[in-house]
Amino acid sequence: MPTKVSLSDSDLFSSQQVASEADQTSKFEERLNPLGRILEIEGYHVWCCSPIYGPDGRVHVFYSRWKNEYKFSGWVSACEVAHAVADSPEGPYQDLGVVLKGRGGDAWDSWAIHNPTIQNVGDRYALFYMGSDGSSLDIEQSDLPSLSDKAYERYYTALV
């Protein structure tokens, strides 16, 4: 049977109390050192790296990438997932190329694959991602880079 819980005003945090706690730096955060970018691929925007150690002891990174011609907002219309590998998390990484791209047609992920997350499940790997489908739009995917930002906005909104 569910337990009923009641809270009094004294049990709740005030917004001032929450804000002051949020301003404090945690011990974990104090130990972080920025390294800069660890993965750059010429001609592409790179986003959302999902690293995992493989059975070979190397770091495998699955990441989103899309051509610079699609501008930064092109993630929703022309993104693919690629794979890179390194001996340590800090790199350097060797790009192994695309592992998954939009399937075309009217599939839910016909145009773009984005935000990969790789997980080890027993002796297999599962790659989770989001996708976008532009098959019902009144434009070809290859025509998007030539649009002005203002003209592109309506397609971006439809895909998001």
Predicted regions, residues:
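Beta-rich carbohydrate-recognition and catalytic domains
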Residues: 1-48, 52-111, 119-160
